[in-house]
């Protein structure tokens, strides 16, 4: 099972609900739900969401944008994202070669 975690002082994860389906699970410290796409959708379409974090309030905002990963034959994947919001963003990225999720905090 692949598990994605959000960092930057905010905690959220994707956890297996049933075979082939992943649902967002938010811990009380995060405030708002960023509602990531199901893992199968991520694998098939390479479309991901990022959660904008507002450090002033300490809560995850409602601003949810779409990320698109392009397919590549190399070890790295290109990432294109929408305009930034607030002060920090956490990206959940599906890596097609390793079939796993990882996070990046910018």
From Swiss-Prot:
The gene is yceQ. It comes from Escherichia coli O6:H1 (strain CFT073 / ATCC 700928 / UPEC). This is Uncharacterized protein YceQ.
